[in-house]
Amino acid sequence: MTHRFLAACRREPVDRVPVWMMRQAGRYQPSYRAVRQKVSFLELCRSPELIAQVTVAPIDEFGFDAAILFSDILVHLPAMGLDLTFEKGEKGKGDGGPKIGNPVRTRADVDALRVPVPKKDLPYVLDGVRAIRTALADRVPLIGFVGGPFTVASYAVEGGSQGFTRLKTMLYAEPATAHALFEKLTQAAIVQIEEQVAAGAQAAQIFESWLGELAREDLEEFSFPYLARIAEAVRKTGVPSIIFSTGTTAHLERMAKLGYDVVSVDWRIPIDEARARLPGVAVQGNYDSTLLLGPREVAVARAQQLLRAAGPTPGYIFNLGHGIQVGTPTENVKAVVDAVHAFGWK
């Protein structure tokens, strides 16, 4: 069976535009909140049965054209030697942001990090992938994912504080230490994706969310070479690859050369301009998730406007410019998904 999402990743013709949304499994869903009333966030991430349950729920509830593994970009950090916790948040269940108890600050800290062995260190993720595939019964494909080296490093180095000051200072003051850190995080990303695909993931998205914090020369030295290596590793698995970032519209042409099948863009650029600047790859995005918080008729109209601007050329996937926000009405999500499915060029 050829899924329209996978076909769009390869810029092949599809019967309708595929749609999925980042954070489509999350706190805006009553079904997700019901699960989270019983377990903490990390407990959820470490339960294959619950991983499958919350991953598949949005497919049943909204009819998305792809599922994405429910996990976290930092889930492997404890296996690398870092003390990861999530703040208690409003409900006391780990709803807050991540905290690293022993952040990476020195070369000795970097040298002490261990590249994880997913089968031994992250079996619940791989078992979760297998459980999802069984539950989906090939209705839609499953996307695996990891965090990009810079984004994961921003949490590992900053320790959970807002901003990027310590990490960016490391780039300039101790570039060899920064490269050593990115090397280990790149290796960690590659082994995770390889094992996710071996377990059944049918595509791979790299969440390099905070890439827009870097100047072009720093991207060239500290990011793009590592992202290209991850893209090559995904290519060897045979599944499509997606690179997601925000604040990087100035660098689209360069990002198109990293080796990814799909470039996911944020809402800060017109989608027709993004497609024109990315002629050799598929494009994903770039609906502003805040629209889903507004009037339903506006949300639907803007989705249709985006589809018209994206055009009929194969290789477009409807998604958000970032994740679904807490408090988003589920009715708006369903209305937009239905509008995308109903849209046609004939």
Curated annotation (Swiss-Prot):
* InterPro entries in the record: UROD/MetE-like_sf, Uroporphyrinogen_deCO2ase_HemE, Uroporphyrinogen_deCOase
Q: Which reaction equation describes what this protein catalyses?
A: uroporphyrinogen III + 4 H(+) = coproporphyrinogen III + 4 CO2
Q: Annotated Gene Ontology MF terms?
A: uroporphyrinogen decarboxylase activity
E.C. designation(s): 4.1.1.37
Q: Does the keyword Signal apply?
A: no
Entries under Pfam families matching the protein: URO-D (PF01208)
Q: Could you give a single Gene Ontology term from the biological process aspect?
A: protoporphyrinogen IX biosynthetic process
Q: Which PROSITE patterns match?
A: UROD_1 (PS00906), UROD_2 (PS00907)
Where does the chain bind substrate?
A: 23-27, 72, 155, 209, 322
User: To which pathway does this protein belong?
Assistant: Porphyrin-containing compound metabolism; protoporphyrin-IX biosynthesis; coproporphyrinogen-III from 5-aminolevulinate: step 4/4
**What is one GO cellular-component annotation here?**
cytosol
Q: Tell me, in one coarse class, where this protein mainly resides.
A: cytoplasm
Q: Where is this site: Transition state stabilizer?
A: 72
List where in the cell it is found.
Answer: Cytoplasm
Domain of life (superkingdom): Bacteria
| Xref: SUPFAM superfamilies | UROD/MetE-like
Q: Which UniProt keywords apply?
A: Cytoplasm, Decarboxylase, Lyase, Porphyrin biosynthesis
Q: Does the keyword Cytoplasm apply?
A: yes
User: Tell me, what does this protein do in biology?
Assistant: Catalyzes the decarboxylation of four acetate groups of uroporphyrinogen-III to yield coproporphyrinogen-III.
Describe the subunit structure: Homodimer.
Give the family, as the similarity comment puts it: Belongs to the uroporphyrinogen decarboxylase family.
Name of the featured protein: Uroporphyrinogen decarboxylase
User: What's the gene?
Assistant: hemE
